[in-house]
């Protein structure tokens, strides 16, 4: 919001700031006064501060960046002969605070007003509270609505009582009322209108499905085990006249039958394979175990020159390592006597050397020869093909047999 002040010569303008404001510019009115300079002063805490000096033909306006907050006591004055215009704007944050306060006041007023519950939802809440008390009275009401003949037999009355008990056994009313209660407490007034429309559509769909339900209900009921049929109501056409049921009773009967159909055990032998699953898994594991054992049986230990023993843990498929070729390997070396690891290289480009050039121990020159890239070999080197009687103190003791696992990474 715009803020402005026109200052006349030699007049003091004093105020206690109510709304914070910002001064952005001071401009001289060149139609007033003479050519003498005009000084703009501001008084804060009893002290005079020069803001700017204006003069016709030289400086007639100056940009400013002055901010005054609520509660500040401030005065403005000029000592020249020209009118000076101070312009700026009110603090927008202050305006937002005012709007927030107004909104808060409006919200408080709305909260004080009693909430209005739609008549339809109010009826549902009352039904939820009185569900237990009305269970005994429901058969009479349903009979009145359906205009049952006065000369009905006692068996028909018993069937209606059993049907009512069957429908009331699941406490469907309570679930529906609880759901509507949650929706009413969390939704706005507009949402309640949408709910009414949805419920009307559901009622229309239920009316269309009523004829199908009369045929489906007996079929679903026949699938129940004998024990459950004894303890619940037989809803076949022979014992229940579906035409006497109200819409709400038909809906509740449909839900009841659907839930019982989900809970009943399968009779077509579907459950039996579940019990046999562990046996099937065990049978599947046996061939897999044989497959894993197969390569182990094929592993053969070979003894080559110098008493070196080799065993291919994995046969590669790449180029073959031959004498004179540069090979790159990952390896891990252990002492045979205690299985203590004394050296390894399992990261980076690997260990590189020329095979057969005596750059490594003799056991490696003969043990790695013949490997293919991608293969892994276990090499057992006797002392004579390793570090001999001297060993390599302090890591390798004298006369030590060494065991290496070597991965061939590349051959050049």
From Swiss-Prot:
What job does this protein perform? Answer: PPIases accelerate the folding of proteins. It catalyzes the cis-trans isomerization of proline imidic peptide bonds in oligopeptides. Binds double-stranded DNA in vitro.
Renumbered residue ranges of the record's region Disordered: 95-304
Cited PROSITE patterns: FKBP_PPIASE (PS50059)
Q: Where is the composition biased (Basic residues)?
A: 247-257
Protein localization: Nucleus
Explain the post-translational modification: Phosphorylated by a nuclear kinase in the presence of Mg(2+) and ATP.
Catalytically driven reaction(s): [protein]-peptidylproline (omega=180) = [protein]-peptidylproline (omega=0)
Activation and inhibition: Inhibited by both FK506 and rapamycin.
Q: What is its main location?
A: nucleus
| Matches recorded under InterPro entries | NPL, PPIase_dom_sf, PPIase_FKBP_dom, PPIase_Fpr3/Fpr4-like
Q: Where is the composition biased (Acidic residues)?
A: 95-113, 169-178, 188-216
Name any one Pfam family assigned in the record.
FKBP_C
Kindly list the GO CC terms recorded for this protein.
Answer: chromatin; nucleolus
A single GO molecular function term of this UniProt record? peptidyl-prolyl cis-trans isomerase activity
Query: What protein name applies here?
Result: 46 kDa FK506-binding nuclear protein
EC number(s) per entry: 5.2.1.8
């Amino acid at each position: 919001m715009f803020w402005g002040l026109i200052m006349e010569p030699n007049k003091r303008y004093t105020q206690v700031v109510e709304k914070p404001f910002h001064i952005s510019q001071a401009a001289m009115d060149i139609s007033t006064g003479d050519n003498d300079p005009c000084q703009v002063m501001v008084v804060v805490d009893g002290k005079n501060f020069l803001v700017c000096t204006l003069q016709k033909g030289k400086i007639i306006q100056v940009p400013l960046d002055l901010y005054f907050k609520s509660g500040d006591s401030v005065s403005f004055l000029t000592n020249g002969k020209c009118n000076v215009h101070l312009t700026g704007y009110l603090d927008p944050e202050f305006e937002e605070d005012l709007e927030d306060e107004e909104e808060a006041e409006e919200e408080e007023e709305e909260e004080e007003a009693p909430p209005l519950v739609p008549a339809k939802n109010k009826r549902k809440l009352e039904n939820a509270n009185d569900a237990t008390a009305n269970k005994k009275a429901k058969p009479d009401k349903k009979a009145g609505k359906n205009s049952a003949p006065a000369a009905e037999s006692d068996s028909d009355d018993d069937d209606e009582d059993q049907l009512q008990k069957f429908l009331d056994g699941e406490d469907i009313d309570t679930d529906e009322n609880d759901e509507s209660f949650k929706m009413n407490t969390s939704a706005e007034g507009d949402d309640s209108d949408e709910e009414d429309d949805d419920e009307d559509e559901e009622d229309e769909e239920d009316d269309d499905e009523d004829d199908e339900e009369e045929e489906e209900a007996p079929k679903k009921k026949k699938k129940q085990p004998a024990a459950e049929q004894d303890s619940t109501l037989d809803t076949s056409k022979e014992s229940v006249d579906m035409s006497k049921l109200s819409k709400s009773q038909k809906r509740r009967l449909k839900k009841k039958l659907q839930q019982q159909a989900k809970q009943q055990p399968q009779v077509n032998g579907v459950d039996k394979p579940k019990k046999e699953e562990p046996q099937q898994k065990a049978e599947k594991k046996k061939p897999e175990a044989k497959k894993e054992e197969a390569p182990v049986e094929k592993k053969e230990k070979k003894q080559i020159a110098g008493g070196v023993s080799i065993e291919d843990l994995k046969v590669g498929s790449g180029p073959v390592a031959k004498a004179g070729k540069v090979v790159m390997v990952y390896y891990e070396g252990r002492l045979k006597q205690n299985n203590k690891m004394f050296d390894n290289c399992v990261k980076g480009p690997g260990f590189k050397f020329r095979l057969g050039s005596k750059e490594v121990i003799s056991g490696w020159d003969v043990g790695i020869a013949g490997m293919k890239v991608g293969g892994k070999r276990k090499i057992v080197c006797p002392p004579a093909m390793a570090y001999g009687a001297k060993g390599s103190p302090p890591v390798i003791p004298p006369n030590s047999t060494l065991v290496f696992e070597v991965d061939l990474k590349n051959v050049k």
